[in-house]
């Protein structure tokens, strides 16, 4: 068991949920569910196991988890994750056909059945469900509400279920084909999550029984209504409306923000994205900027719907994602619970990050010394790392972070706006930044770093070396951190010529480099968001006579967002020292731009 796993085991919550075991390459090799995540995941690394489990444990290099609200939700989520990732240690149940389904038969008088085989027989299939117990629980509820045919008796003979109101004897009750088709439609709507009609019918019957002093019958309908409500909660992870949607949640603490996105495809929660970064503005503004950049990434296709937390401005999100995406801010019910689940997982992820950092920092001194030995250089007490950030060449920036004795020294961090480069040219941008940084180090007699780490491969390293050696006559070791196709820290490049330094992925040295790369990447992205936000803000204020840079800055500082300015009065803007005529012209322009 490596140190990362040891640390993460200590931080597991006692909640139900799913866990995903990963190998040294970051591949998901097993998905499991648990009523108690802490107890279940810890059990893999304690005591003896059978041969199959021992083999699994031997390949586990890391794990992650998703917290759910109930064990049933964990069961449903487990199915989705297994079908999406097909981990090699899970039983591969292709197409979910070994799981139970609820079926409505295509007969003149349809029946409700449970089956494990999906056939092209014209029947309607709902599921899959995690186990027979879950399917039976739902079918029993359906049987109590919808009086489908439940027997194979001849037409002139009624069954037991007829006497308890759960079967319409097709001959005696003179039901028509239209009646049965209507019943089928009601069940389809019910299982697809549209149960308001049924609940209202049950409430009406409960009131009717109560008015007739039939209190036992009224209690039966009350119990049915409660059962429907419980079912609605238990089926939260598999939405029966088959809609594609992204569900956003976030959490902020200690100057950091964690954004958690649940990807729901065809009604099933199949994947999530977790991103953590320092934030420097208002939390809502940084969250909005994140959403805007999230869908600029070609890996993230826009869904049909987006759910956002209640404290986020809906109109701002709609402006960011465009008219083709519907944005919802759920206030109650199942959809609100999904957003709450994303918020809860964001909090768990960020809390875990802080706890892991505290544990890791204590071990970094030895990692620094070993890193120097592996690279053949003196112990790199001070490390400076660089990264660029831009979107298609717009608002290009770069950033530098400093680690001393394995700890970030934020007072030494530096931000750079690219001044001499036009368009998206990472190499030219980095050449400018390295020149500016180390010209100053040389000119002002500052202490140079023991190691420079570039967030990139051979090209970035060669650019830095060229500037240092041939322009500035400085001798500072330069290494590169290369990422894999999943955008994860993968290899350390160093030497002349460059070579891969062999670092075990679970070593403290690798964790240190990963933290450095993660920090410089987040710092650069956050700075880029700030610059783009200010540029966008400023451009919308252009063209108003009497509104210069200083007054724009006042507006930005006090109102934080364009939405806030649009909602302000002339008097609110005048309070900042802006003349009434200019304030009115500004509001008129913003009103025109919004139409």
Swiss-Prot record:
<keyword id="KW-0963">Cytoplasm</keyword>
<dbReference type="Pfam" id="PF08459">
    <property type="entry name" value="UvrC_RNaseH_dom"/>
</dbReference>
<dbReference type="GO" id="GO:0006289">
    <property type="term" value="P:nucleotide-excision repair"/>
</dbReference>
<keyword id="KW-0227">DNA damage</keyword>
<dbReference type="GO" id="GO:0009380">
    <property type="term" value="C:excinuclease repair complex"/>
</dbReference>
<feature type="domain" description="UVR">
    <location>
        <begin position="196"/>
        <end position="231"/>
    </location>
</feature>
<dbReference type="InterPro" id="IPR036876">
    <property type="entry name" value="UVR_dom_sf"/>
</dbReference>
<dbReference type="InterPro" id="IPR047296">
    <property type="entry name" value="GIY-YIG_UvrC_Cho"/>
</dbReference>
<feature type="domain" description="GIY-YIG">
    <location>
        <begin position="14"/>
        <end position="91"/>
    </location>
</feature>
<keyword id="KW-0234">DNA repair</keyword>
<dbReference type="InterPro" id="IPR050066">
    <property type="entry name" value="UvrABC_protein_C"/>
</dbReference>
<dbReference type="InterPro" id="IPR001162">
    <property type="entry name" value="UvrC_RNase_H_dom"/>
</dbReference>
<dbReference type="InterPro" id="IPR038476">
    <property type="entry name" value="UvrC_RNase_H_dom_sf"/>
</dbReference>
<dbReference type="Pfam" id="PF22920">
    <property type="entry name" value="UvrC_RNaseH"/>
</dbReference>
<dbReference type="Pfam" id="PF02151">
    <property type="entry name" value="UVR"/>
</dbReference>
<comment type="subunit">
    <text>Interacts with UvrB in an incision complex.</text>
</comment>
<dbReference type="InterPro" id="IPR010994">
    <property type="entry name" value="RuvA_2-like"/>
</dbReference>
<dbReference type="GO" id="GO:0009381">
    <property type="term" value="F:excinuclease ABC activity"/>
</dbReference>
<dbReference type="InterPro" id="IPR000305">
    <property type="entry name" value="GIY-YIG_endonuc"/>
</dbReference>
<dbReference type="InterPro" id="IPR004791">
    <property type="entry name" value="UvrC"/>
</dbReference>
<comment type="function">
    <text>The UvrABC repair system catalyzes the recognition and processing of DNA lesions. UvrC both incises the 5' and 3' sides of the lesion. The N-terminal half is responsible for the 3' incision and the C-terminal half is responsible for the 5' incision.</text>
</comment>
<keyword id="KW-0267">Excision nuclease</keyword>
<dbReference type="InterPro" id="IPR001943">
    <property type="entry name" value="UVR_dom"/>
</dbReference>
<comment type="similarity">
    <text>Belongs to the UvrC family.</text>
</comment>
<dbReference type="GO" id="GO:0003677">
    <property type="term" value="F:DNA binding"/>
</dbReference>
<dbReference type="GO" id="GO:0005737">
    <property type="term" value="C:cytoplasm"/>
</dbReference>
<dbReference type="InterPro" id="IPR035901">
    <property type="entry name" value="GIY-YIG_endonuc_sf"/>
</dbReference>
<dbReference type="Pfam" id="PF01541">
    <property type="entry name" value="GIY-YIG"/>
</dbReference>
<protein>
    <recommendedName>
        <fullName>UvrABC system protein C</fullName>
    </recommendedName>
</protein>
<keyword id="KW-0742">SOS response</keyword>
<dbReference type="GO" id="GO:0009432">
    <property type="term" value="P:SOS response"/>
</dbReference>
<keyword id="KW-0228">DNA excision</keyword>
<dbReference type="Pfam" id="PF14520">
    <property type="entry name" value="HHH_5"/>
</dbReference>
């Amino acid at each position: 068991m490596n140190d990362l796993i040891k640390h993460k085991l200590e931080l597991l919550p006692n909640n139900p949920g799913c866990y995903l075991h990963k190998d040294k390459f970051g591949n998901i090799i097993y998905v499991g569910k648990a009523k108690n995540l802490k107890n279940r995941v810890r059990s893999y690394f304690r005591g003896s196991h059978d041969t199959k489990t021992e083999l699994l444990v031997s390949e586990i290099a890391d794990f992650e988890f998703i917290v759910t609200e109930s064990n049933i939700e964990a069961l449903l989520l487990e199915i989705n994750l297994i079908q999406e990732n097909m981990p090699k240690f899970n039983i591969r149940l292709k197409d979910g056909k070994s799981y139970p389904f609820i079926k409505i038969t295509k007969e003149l008088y349809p029946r409700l059945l449970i089956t494990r085989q999906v056939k092209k027989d014209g029947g309607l299939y709902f599921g899959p469900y995690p186990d027979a117990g879950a399917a039976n629980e739902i079918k029993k509820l359906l049987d109590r509400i919808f009086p489908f045919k439940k027997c194979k008796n001849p037409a002139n003979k009624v069954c037991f279920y007829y006497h308890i109101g759960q079967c319409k004897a097709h001959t005696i009750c003179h039901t028509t084909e239209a009646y049965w088709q209507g019943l089928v439609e009601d069940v389809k709507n019910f299982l697809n999550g549209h149960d308001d009609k049924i609940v209202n019918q049950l409430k009406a019957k409960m009131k009717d029984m109560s008015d007739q002093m039939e209190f036992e019958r009224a209690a039966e309908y009350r119990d049915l209504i409660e059962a429907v409500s419980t079912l609605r909660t238990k089926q939260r992870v598999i939405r029966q409306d088959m809609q594609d949607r992204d569900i956003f949640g976030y959490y902020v603490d200690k100057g950091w923000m964690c954004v958690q996105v649940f990807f729901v495809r065809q009604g099933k929660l199949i994947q999530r994205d977790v991103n953590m970064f320092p934030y420097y503005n208002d939390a809502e503004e940084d969250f909005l900027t994140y959403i805007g950049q999230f869908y600029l990434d070609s890996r993230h296709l826009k869904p049909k719907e987006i759910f956002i937390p209640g404290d986020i401005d809906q109109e701002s999100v709609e402006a960011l994602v465009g008219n083709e995406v519907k944005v919802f801010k759920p206030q109650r019910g199942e959809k609100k619970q999904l957003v709450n689940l994303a918020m809860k997982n964001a909090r768990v992820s960020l809390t875990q990050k802080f706890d892991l950092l505290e544990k890791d920092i204590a071990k970094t001194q030895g990692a620094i010394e070993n890193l120097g030995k592996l690279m053949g250089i003196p112990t790199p007490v001070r490390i400076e790392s660089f990264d660029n950030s831009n979107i298609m060449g717009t608002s290009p920036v770069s950033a530098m972070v400093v680690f001393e004795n394995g700890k970030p020294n934020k007072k030494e961090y530096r931000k750079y706006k690219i001044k001499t480069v036009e368009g998206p040219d990472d190499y030219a941008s980095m050449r400018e930044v390295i020149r500016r940084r180390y010209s100053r180090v040389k000119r002002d007699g500052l202490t140079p770093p023991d190691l420079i780490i570039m967030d990139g491969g051979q090209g970035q390293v060669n650019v830095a070396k060229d500037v240092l050696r041939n322009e500035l006559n400085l001798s500072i070791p330069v290494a590169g951190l290369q990422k894999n196709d999943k955008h994860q820290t993968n290899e350390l490049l160093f030497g002349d010529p460059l070579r891969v330094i062999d670092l075990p992925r679970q070593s403290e040295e690798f964790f240190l480099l990963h933290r450095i790369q993660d920090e410089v990447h987040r710092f650069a992205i956050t700075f880029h968001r700030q610059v783009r936000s200010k540029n966008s803000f400023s451009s919308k204020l252009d063209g108003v006579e009497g509104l210069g840079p200083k007054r724009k800055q006042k507006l930005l500082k006090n109102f934080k967002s364009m939405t806030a300015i649009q909602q302000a009065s002339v008097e609110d803007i005048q309070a900042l020292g802006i003349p009434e005529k200019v304030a009115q012209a500004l509001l008129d322009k913003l009103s025109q731009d919004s139409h």
